[in-house]
Amino acid sequence: MTSDATAQLLALITSVLYASALVSARAGLRYSTPTTVTLFSILMQNLLLWSAVFASGGVHAVPLAGVLLFTVVGIFQLGVRLLAYTGAEKIGASRSSALQSVSPLVSATIAVAILGEEPSVLIVVGTVLVVAGIVLVSWKPEQQLAAFRRWHLLLPLGAAFLTGMNHPIRRYVLTMANEPLFFSALMGTVSLAGFLIYLAASPRSQKLVWARKAFWPFVGTGLFETLSILLIITAISMGRVVVVAPIAASYPIWALIEARIFLRQMEPINLKTVLGIFSVVAGNVAIHLGK
């Protein structure tokens, strides 16, 4: 199996794992809060990944520039979480998810302009199909929000932009030092520090609820999200951003399927949903054939 093919497989597994993290979090959020699951997930990420780093021989030599750039990535990742949660609160989860789905287009643009990657026509077509499919599946009619403001749309778009920037930065750093495990752990530490600062700066608006019934779902969330972070960084170390990013972004499809199976959420499968799933599948096939 070529490195590009392996990267695609890891990106696909990443999308399934991240969808599992979202579904598991949704189960726990019946008894707790988004702030709690975010902190729980970041703590597990640090515990698991730093344990793996030291179990595999400790920290290897990495350039300072790489450490600094992945520190920026960790800050961006925290920004993605906060913007995504706030966007879901302000304009609804489905609209927020649909707008965030443009992130592969941002990643591809930066990868082509700065990293010099050259996507084939099939990869470009596949990326557009994946984004269009995610929008079709994610966007659902929701009630009008009295407090809605047009600038609220910038929240999920900001999350998409930060996500799109993260992938090329990761790819660049991994060409300097191919240490995906260490950089994944470093990103978790930066996210934890940033999140604790955020909690200290806004204690009244952020509520931590430690509920027993939420414990195991949040353990699942932390485990799935940690594995998804490690695998996406490993995938980017092996393959081009223009190939990996759109495949990893197809997680809303898997979240829809898993929610029906594990949460018994019987969302209607209408023509729009079928077209969206077909578009994502066709897009992934096109990306694979165009590699």
Q: Where are the model-predicted features located?
A:
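Membrane-interface interhelical linkers
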Residues: 1-75, 81-91, 132, 139-157, ...
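Transmembrane alpha-helical core residues of multi-pass small-molecule transporters
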Residues: 41-45, 103, 129, 187-191, ...
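Juxtamembrane helix-start motifs in multi-pass secondary transporters
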Residues: 34-38, 96, 182-183
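Selected transmembrane alpha-helices and immediately adjacent juxtamembrane segments
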Residues: 151-175, 179-182
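MFS transmembrane alpha-helix packing/gate-lining sites
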Residues: 17, 76, 102-103, 162, ...
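C-terminal transmembrane-helix exit sites in multi-pass transporters
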Residues: 104-125, 135-137, 253-274
